Amino acid sequence: MKILVVDDEQDICEILQFNLETEGYEVDTANSAEEAMMKPLENYDLIMLDVMMGEMSGFQMARKLKDNANTADLPIIFITALDDEDNTAKGLNLGGDDYISKPLSIKEVKARVRAVLRRTTQHNKQVDDNTDY
């Protein structure tokens, strides 16, 4: 499974990359939404996306992903210090699959990543099982 971590804090990217790689995931990082948008996003199984970044926010990037047919079904976990009800609801309403508040608990991050990927994998299997060939 391939994960892209997008956060303007390099330390967060490195911590998440190290810990998720120890779980067996292949992890790439980007320090801005603009940098992330230049990657072949359809090749990832999950995007972990900081909300507050420079030019383009995580919410803006999520909107672009959901508006593109190639990335519309890509799961998103928002990571943010904006730990309030309005921002959580906004992220989920934009198509986010989960919302994790900073400071991060690595144990919680790993569990949430597993849960989102498990749901996505099960959904994709159901779609495949229901497809007539």
Residue map of PLM features:
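Two-component/phosphorelay signaling modules centered on CheY-like receiver
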Residues: 10-28
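The feature encodes the CheY-like receiver
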Residues: 13, 53-54, 72, 84, ...
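Active-site beta3 strand of CheY-like receiver
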Residues: 43-49
